[in-house]
């Protein structure tokens, strides 16, 4: 977070040094790009990784989640309209590697807002999720657990 603040400060200083009559976004943007270059050159002196990398990971995460949301919505609609007799609802458990409260909460929210599944309970040690799914056949169960693991990997990548 310090890198973003520093980059914005560099951009504002750039605007001030240009001595223009009024604020121009193009000047601020060019100052921001100059700040990016400076911070990239000096990022080894910061304790965190270069912040643009985390922004890229967050964008990638959003894309993956939107894809999963759309495909699971279509799958749930398909079950409701055409496969009501074939549904096999049930519970399954998932053991997580996440440790921080915010990341566990975020994963819980991602599971809950994905159609066809919801978190019923989290164990006392916050390591195991108990999830209700619209279909717990082997194929669907594996697919759900794979997508949850993928979410978990992306959360770990963002939180590094």
From Swiss-Prot:
Pfam families registered for this protein in UniProt: MNHE
Record-stated family: Belongs to the CPA3 antiporters (TC 2.A.63) subunit E family.
Keyword terms of this UniProt record: Antiport, Cell membrane, Ion transport, Membrane, Transmembrane, Transmembrane helix, Transport
Segments traversing the membrane: 22-42, 55-75, 100-120
Gene Ontology MF terms: antiporter activity; monoatomic cation transmembrane transporter activity
Function: Expression of the mnh2 operon in E.coli is not able to catalyze Na(+)Li(+)/H(+) antiport. It does however confer higher growth rates than the control strain at up to pH 9.5. The operon may encode an NADH-ubiquinone oxidoreductase.
Membrane topology, from the record: Multi-pass membrane protein
Main subcellular location: membrane
Name of the gene: mnhE2
Entry annotated with the keyword Calcium: no
Subunit structure as annotated in this protein's UniProt entry: May form a heterooligomeric complex that consists of seven subunits: mnhA2, mnhB2, mnhC2, mnhD2, mnhE2, mnhF2 and mnhG2.
Keyword Metal-binding: no
GO (cellular component) term, any one: plasma membrane
Subcellular location(s) of the protein: Cell membrane
The protein, known as: Putative antiporter subunit mnhE2
